[in-house]
Structure formats: C-alpha cells, structure tokens
C-alpha cells in the first residue's frame, strides 16, 4: 500500500473505526490516563516496539499517569494510512 497524504474525507471515514481519537492540527490525537507512572511508561514501551517495527514514531508527551499521543507523517505533512495503522495498534495495546 502506497503511503499518501489522506484527504479530509478519507480521514473522517477512517476515524469511524477510531472514535476515541480526535483530529487536530493535521494530526490524530488521543489522551490516555493510567493509574500511575509505571503503567503509563509500560504502555509507551509497548508502543515503542511497534513503532520501531513500522519505522513510524509518535509524537508524545508523558506527565506522570497521562500519555498524549499525536500522530502524523511529518515527511508527508499530515495524516497517512501509516498513522491510522499505528493508531489502531495503539488502541489494541491499551485495550488488550
């Protein structure tokens, strides 16, 4: 599958299967809350392994038990199928 910049219409259609993610400033964005820092960091570690396998890495912020993830394909200038694929994988980790 070719990685191309998705249109607004394509993003809205794909977001139907990612209802807890928002689109903001050309990125897919989601805030995750955990019980403590260890859980949050463990979650980030799992994402790091998947991200490395996809060669696609999130922009993220971690403050204690909260992780905010922003996904976009920087070299494409917006959201691509790679971001969608990573978002789906992240949700699978969180809700496994």
UniProtKB/Swiss-Prot annotation:
Coiled-coil stretches noted in the UniProt entry, renumbered to this chain: none
State the family it belongs to: Belongs to the pterin-4-alpha-carbinolamine dehydratase family.
Q: Which UniProt keywords apply?
A: Lyase
The name this protein goes by in its record = Putative pterin-4-alpha-carbinolamine dehydratase
An individual GO BP term = tetrahydrobiopterin biosynthetic process
UniProt keyword annotation of NADP present: no
Known EC number: 4.2.1.96
A single GO molecular function term of this UniProt record: 4-alpha-hydroxytetrahydrobiopterin dehydratase activity
């Amino acid at each position: 599958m070719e990685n191309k910049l998705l249109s607004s219409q394509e993003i809205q259609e794909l977001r139907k299967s990612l209802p807890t993610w928002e689109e903001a400033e050309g990125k897919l964005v989601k805030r995750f809350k955990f019980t403590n820092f260890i859980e949050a960091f463990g979650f980030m570690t799992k994402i790091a392994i998947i991200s490395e396998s996809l060669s696609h890495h999130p922009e993220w912020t971690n403050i204690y038990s909260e992780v905010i993830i922003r996904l976009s394909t920087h070299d494409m200038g917006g959201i691509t199928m790679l971001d969608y694929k990573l978002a789906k994988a992240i949700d699978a980790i969180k809700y496994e």
